[in-house]
């Protein structure tokens, strides 16, 4: 099965509890459509370069998903219907990045 990198931005007004609920809901949806969540990362509440739907910040999250193309089409369709998700990007990748991603690394400025 192919592996997909799925990054999404959730509304800034979500509490940590609501964000966890959103992530668990997306994970449950993956199981329901026959996909597997391989890895999940929360990157934090980050500023936007411009306002999106009256939000100046957003909760950035990354998921690595193993799924058939038809299942990913259904997943993307259902995520579009979720009002808490402002934007998302889904890319097909060859493998899952091992360890922490660059966004999870520490600031050494």
UniProtKB/Swiss-Prot annotation:
Assigned keywords, A-Z: Ribonucleoprotein, Ribosomal protein, RNA-binding, rRNA-binding
Record-level Gene Ontology MF annotations: small ribosomal subunit rRNA binding; structural constituent of ribosome
Any single GO CC term annotated in Swiss-Prot or TrEMBL for this entry: cytosolic small ribosomal subunit
Record Pfam families: Ribosomal_S6
Record has Amino-acid biosynthesis as a keyword: no
Residues in the signal sequence: none
Matching InterPro entries: Ribosomal_bS6, Ribosomal_bS6_sf, Ribosomal_S6_plastid/chlpt, Transl_elong_EF1B/ribsomal_bS6
GO biological process: translation
Task performed by this protein: Binds together with bS18 to 16S ribosomal RNA.
Family stated for the protein in its record: Belongs to the bacterial ribosomal protein bS6 family.
Protein name, per record: Small ribosomal subunit protein bS6
Protein's organism: Anaplasma marginale (strain St. Maries)
The organism's taxonomic lineage, starting at the top: Bacteria, Pseudomonadati, Pseudomonadota, Alphaproteobacteria, Rickettsiales
Name of encoding gene: rpsF
